[in-house]
UniProtKB/Swiss-Prot annotation:
GO-annotated cellular components: host cell Golgi membrane; host cell plasma membrane; membrane; viral tegument; virion membrane
UniProt region (Disordered), positions on chain: 53-75
Pfam family membership, one: Herpesvir_UL11
Lineage of origin: Viruses, Duplodnaviria, Heunggongvirae, Peploviricota, Herviviricetes
Protein name: Cytoplasmic envelopment protein 3
Species in which this protein is naturally found: Epstein-Barr virus (strain B95-8) (HHV-4)
Lipidation (N-myristoyl glycine): G2
Modifications the protein undergoes after translation, according to the UniProt entry: Myristoylation and palmitoylation (probably on one or more of the nearby cysteines at the N-terminus) enable membrane-binding and Golgi apparatus-specific targeting and are essential for efficient packaging. Phosphorylated. Phosphorylation does not seem to be required for recycling to the host Golgi apparatus. Packaging is selective for underphosphorylated forms.
Lineage top rank: taxon: Viruses
Amino acid sequence: MGALWSLCRRRVNSIGDVDGGIINLYNDYEEFNLETTKLIAAEEGRACGETNEGLEYDEDSENDELLFLPNKKPN
């Protein structure tokens, strides 16, 4: 992971996180590691087809997918 952080640090000053915030790669190595782990987990969940099945139904929603793991491309 250190090599990845080093490479990214040379290329960009900051990166967006899963929650919509910004991580400064120069100052926050631990946060970068944590966010990378979250992003990898989100991608693995998307690959496995995780959904919100069993959760409270929202009539306004056209699908039951996790908001942070969209399986469909927006129109």
